[in-house]
Each structure stands twice: as C-alpha cells, then as structure tokens.
Amino acid sequence: IELLPILIQTARGLFVAHSHGVIHRDVKPANIMVSDTGEVKITDFGVSYSTGQGQITQDGMVVGTAQYISPEQAQGQQATPQSDIYSLGVVAYEGLAGHRPFTGTTPVDIAAAHVNNPVPPLPDSVDVQLREFVMSMLAKDPLDRPKDALVVSRTLARIERRLLDQ
C-alpha cells in the first residue's frame, strides 16, 4: 500500500471534519482504515471535539494517544485543526522512517518528548521536499504548521505527482 495516497485522503477527510468544526484529537494509523479499493475512512471520532459544543473536557485534561499526540495536547491545551495535522505528521513520519519519532517507557515520557525533544531527521532516502513538508507538519508551534489540512492534502498530492513523473 502506498503511503502518500493514504495521507492525502486522510488530510482531505480531516479538512472536511475541521470545516464542520470537528477536531478528531486522536489521529493515528489504527484510526485510518483503507478499503480494498484504496479508499480511506477515518474512524473513531469518539474523542473528537466540536468547536460548537461546550467544553466537555476539563482544562489540563489530556486526550489522545501518546505516540501521536501534539505538543499542545500533551500540555493539556485545547486541540485545534493544527493538532490533527501534527498527529498526521507523526503517521507520515512513521510510514517514511519505519518508526515513530519519539519513544519512551511510559505514555507520559512519550508525550513529554513531543513537547521537549527535537524531531529526529527523516532518512536521507526520503525525497527532500517530502521530508521538509512532513517536518513542517511536526513543528512544535501550531502556528508554524501548515495552515489547514487542505494545504496538507494539496501539497502532498503535488509531491506525489512530481515523484510519479520522475
């Protein structure tokens, strides 16, 4: 299964959710289902947050999976569309490198690494444009990440087309 089409479709799906005020908060491979025809479905919106509803989690409450959690979520801050972009960046990193960017003995150690540790570079074997873009998705500051998930899907689609044309 090719990684880029999965990432592109997942980003599109997240953009649709975000444009309806829904933030997933737990983007990870287990929540990205791929059909036999290659169609992607994002599952488990059980911990999602709707910007239109009252706050259902207390300030400081951490929601998400440690291996894929954004730095701001790990610090108990409100998740935003950029939080989902970060988590999708972790999925992309794992697909390209063969391992997650951060490990630790406990979920707290892993979440702390997302906050405090620089993201290890992706292998040189990964296309330089793709490498740089995935690293931008993993920026510690949400404002340094791509503007929205549509930008993510379009940029990845452009990179995919260029790689296919080579």
Regions found by a protein language model. Name each.
Residues 1-165:
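Eukaryotic protein kinase
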